[in-house]
Amino acid sequence: MAGDEPLPGDGQRRRYLIGYALAPKKQQSFIQPSLVSRAAGRGMDLVPVDPSRPLPEQGPFHLLIHKLYGEEWRGQLDAFSAAHPAVPVVDPPHAIDRLHNRISMLQVVSELDVPLHAHHHHTFGIPSQVVVYDAAALSDSGLLAALRFPLIAKPLVADGTAKSHKMSLVYHREGLRKLRPPLVLQEFVNHGGVIFKVYVVGAHVTCVKRRSLPDVSSDVLQDASAEGSLSFSQVSNLPNERTAQEYYDDMRLEDAIMPPTAFINDIAAALRRALGLHLFNFDMIRDARAGDRYLVIDINYFPGYAKMPGYETVLTDFFWEMVHKDDDTPNLNPNPNDEDVK
């Protein structure tokens, strides 16, 4: 097996193997030459994992990162962790599971314990939302009584598939007829067409701003002849290009004020503790009705980090921290002549 061969640099300095198990598309976007080079310069070699082969036949790994799903893969990870308890697996499948359901995903935000007094008048929460399990419930006025149009309809399951990204912006009740449960109906809150994407990598936090769906005017909501709903795939994708372009001609993304850094960091740290995850991002908007209130609208596991500025350095630092997490990290290199130089 691979572990029986000397690792690069044997006899000079210890090298660490970082195994990654990713879908082909994810691997193509995340494992960039710049990341591989940066990690190698720190003594860490990124090695692809073949999920069709038993993990004990591969490696030996000092850290395992992954974004694969299924019972067979989960069984592989459980067996690996039982055999190598000192080797970090980022992240545990049971912790990731919570993000696959859009209700449990945001419920954790409501349960966070963040000392808001330290941030003066800034507050955060989630939009009002309900889960709909069958089509009959869409005509239940009682179920929808707590919500105000417009609404965003999202699939209940958020598993990274194309289907889970298909969403609709619903302007009035007529638009509900096209929806296919199970799904989550979430109030669309005007937010100036700007979304804040907060990337979390261990203790590191980076916040960037992106264009989002344009605000919905009261005229649109009152226009009975207008389309009842519009479909789109991501919050940053525009359902109506002409209207959106007119909207963005009147606003500049660079003028949008970023949330306070300490405020963002505290929310990120609280989410990291509550979720038990190292790699995730969350999307946040500023409520246009109250400029000091922010709403978390989505949380994603192992997002597209290549879009994050300086991601190579951030991820390399994270890998280094994880392989040195325990001072007693075992030397998994079977070569007895290997020197443990850190």
Curated annotation (Swiss-Prot):
List of residues binding Mg(2+) 1: D283, D298
Gene3D superfamilies for the chain: ATP-grasp fold, B domain
Residues that hold 1D-myo-inositol 1,3,4-trisphosphate according to the record: K25, K67, H165, K197, N300
InterPro entries with a match to the protein in the record: Inositol_tetrakis-P_1-kinase, InsP(3)kin_ATP-grasp, ITPK1_N
Protein's recorded name: Inositol-tetrakisphosphate 1-kinase 5
EC number(s) given by UniProt: 2.7.1.134, 2.7.1.159
Similarity comment: Belongs to the ITPK1 family.
Protein purpose: Kinase that can phosphorylate various inositol polyphosphate such as Ins(3,4,5,6)P4 or Ins(1,3,4)P3 and participates in phytic acid biosynthesis in developing seeds. Phytic acid is the primary storage form of phosphorus in cereal grains and other plant seeds.
Keywords linked to the UniProt accession: ATP-binding, Kinase, Magnesium, Metal-binding, Nucleotide-binding, Transferase
